[in-house]
């Protein structure tokens, strides 16, 4: 099978010439056999290209612009399709060719063609999401534990402060009671001293009475 690339060598459009050079240069660099067909100097080539490009790939005026790529009689695509296939590393599938053995393109195409590739990717994504959720849950639990311990330590400090205040209040009351006891003791001793003085005054009066009797 031979790849056919329809180009316009005498095109006045710089954009078209750049696209043609990119396609041809890529095929040459990757040693892909192809045949370059000029539609500018060969009316048969131009007619064949226009007739074999699918209708959905033709512009509104019905005249497809080069470069157009075919694999023998089968249409491969235009430059935009070629560029997308090159970026996705599926250029050999785009051209309808078997990739050379051991090439990077072969591995990427095999991976993209696996039926369970999407499922495996989804499973890996789900596993990663589960691990992240578990880690976030552990972090939240640790935060809650630290908050609980902080509240307990605060409550313990408050209790200790209240206990200290209570002890100080009791000591103050004991001191006040001791002061009251001292004052009451002094008042009780004062009447006793007064009574003793009165008794001493009565004794001289009695002695005076005895003198008069004698």
UniProtKB/Swiss-Prot annotation:
Q: Which GO molecular function, any one, fits this protein according to its record?
A: SH3 domain binding
Residue span of region Disordered: 101-214
Can you tell which superkingdom this protein's organism belongs to? Eukaryota
- Which CDD domains is this protein grouped with? GRX_SH3BGR
Q: Which residues cross the membrane?
A: none
Q: Locate the compositionally biased regions of type Basic and acidic residues.
A: 129-144
Please state what the protein is called: SH3 domain-binding glutamic acid-rich protein
- Tell me what organism the protein belongs to: Mus musculus
């Amino acid at each position: 099978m031979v790849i056919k690339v329809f180009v316009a060598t005498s095109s006045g459009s710089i954009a078209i010439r750049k696209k043609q050079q990119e396609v041809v240069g890529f095929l040459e660099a990757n040693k892909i056999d192809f045949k370059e067909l000029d539609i500018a100097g060969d009316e048969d080539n131009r007619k064949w290209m226009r007739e074999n490009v699918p209708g959905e790939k033709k512009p509104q005026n019905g005249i497809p612009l080069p470069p157009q790529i075919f694999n023998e009689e089968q249409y491969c695509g235009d430059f935009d399709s070629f560029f997308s296939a090159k970026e996705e590393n599926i250029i050999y599938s785009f051209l309808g060719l078997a990739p050379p053995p051991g090439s990077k393109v072969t591995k990427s195409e095999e991976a993209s063609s696996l039926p369970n590739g999407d499922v495996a990717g989804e499973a890996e994504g789900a596993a990663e999401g589960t691990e992240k959720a578990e880690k976030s849950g552990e972090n939240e639990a640790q935060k809650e534990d630290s908050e609980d311990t902080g509240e307990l330590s605060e409550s313990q400090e408050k209790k200790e402060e209240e206990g200290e205040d209570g002890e100080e209040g009791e000591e103050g009351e004991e001191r006040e009671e001791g002061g009251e006891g001292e004052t009451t003791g002094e008042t009780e001793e004062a009447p006793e001293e007064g009574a003793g003085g009165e008794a001493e005054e009565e004794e001289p009066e009695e002695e005076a009475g005895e003198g008069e009797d004698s």
